[in-house]
Amino acid sequence: GYNLSKSYKSLKALDNVSINCKKGEIIGLVGANGSGKSTLFKILLGVLKPDTGNVTINSKKTKPIGGIIEKPALYEYLNAFENLKVFGRIQGLKITNDFVEESLKKVGLPVDRKDPVKNFSMGMKQRLSIAIALLNNPECLVLDEPFSGLDPMGISSLNTLITTLAEEQELAILISSHILGELNKICDRLTVIKNGKIIKSGTTRDIISQSTVAYTIAALDISSSLVLKKYDTTIKNNQATVKISYTDISELLYKLREENIHITSCVPEVDMNKLFEN
């Protein structure tokens, strides 16, 4: 999308927003409620028309872009198989049983489950919605808050699916979420939107690093470290939270390894106020 603007009466929901996503790339969109994320996604999917600007997708396919906006919109009284058949026909596809089975397998859903989707977990509903979004083989996928309502296992499983779609099918994927830690794991680039304007855009590492105020380091023997005593550190169980900048964290991790501290994870703690500073 290029130079996209959209107003609702006196409210400017989007103000000259430009965003791009390449084949095989995952772009994360970060913003508070009311920042313009859903409006942007609706414009990209053709649900809304922008007041100014345009959406360009380099694709000759029948459906160049697919997506989920907010909660999955499914026929709750139908099973997964039947949902795919209905949505396939709506999109003008000739649906065979083999095609439906392949679509379900692609997103990791069982092909033999016959009960209505109202019985499905939120994670399974998200997967089914993605299968529907992928009908007609679009080259771009837009996911608005796909982790909402999922437990940690469901989030991890969905992350794996998203990265697989980007890597193996070379889909361009644009995803929004309030869970910054998950975007940090899977996104190549991050874009920060505030009051309808893009205020930051860059590699995930750069955007996260600029707003990081501490790191939480996990290791079974972390409390035995002498190096950590030189830093502003809080140790609880097998985790140490260290107030340190991203420019110094690599050196600290090196020193911990020299002490034979077996690190299992190192997670940045982001100051959200800093992230949303213009």
Sequence positions of predicted segments:
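The feature captures the beta-strand-to-loop junction immediately N-terminal to the Walker
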Residues: 30-32
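Conserved ABC transporter NBD signature motif
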Residues: 46, 53-65
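C-terminal coupling/interaction segments
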Residues: 244-278
